[in-house]
């Protein structure tokens, strides 16, 4: 279970 914040953080991390 991931929260929108965690998901957003993961997206940014992968994008970099």
From Swiss-Prot:
Uppermost EC category: hydrolase
Keyword Protease: yes
Transmembrane segments: none
Activity modulation comment: Inhibited by EDTA and EGTA, but not by PMSF and leupeptin.
Record GO biological process: proteolysis
E.C. number(s) listed in UniProt: 3.4.24.-
Subunit details: Monomer.
Family of this protein: Belongs to the venom metalloproteinase (M12B) family. P-III subfamily. P-IIIa sub-subfamily.
Cofactor: Zn(2+)
Keywords associated with the record: Calcium, Fibrinogenolytic toxin, Glycoprotein, Hemostasis impairing toxin, Hydrolase, Metal-binding, Metalloprotease, Protease, Secreted, Toxin, Zinc
Post-translational modification: Glycosylated.
Organism listed in the record: Naja atra
Cell compartments where the protein resides: Secreted
Expression (tissue specificity): Expressed by the venom gland.
GO-annotated molecular function: metal ion binding; metallopeptidase activity; toxin activity
Domain Peptidase M12B: 14-16
Miscellaneous comment: Negative results: does not degrade the beta- and the gamma-chain of fibrinogen. Does not induce skin hemorrhage when subcutaneously injected into mice (5 or 50 ug).
Source species, domain of life: Eukaryota
Cofactor mode of binding and number, as noted: Binds 1 zinc ion per subunit.
Protein name per Swiss-Prot or TrEMBL: Zinc metalloproteinase atrahagin
General function of this protein: Snake venom zinc metalloprotease that causes mast cell degranulation and histamine release. Selectively degrades the alpha-chain of human fibrinogen (FGA).
Any Gene Ontology CC annotation: extracellular region
């Amino acid at each position: 279970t991931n929260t929108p914040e965690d998901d957003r953080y993961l997206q940014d991390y992968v994008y970099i």
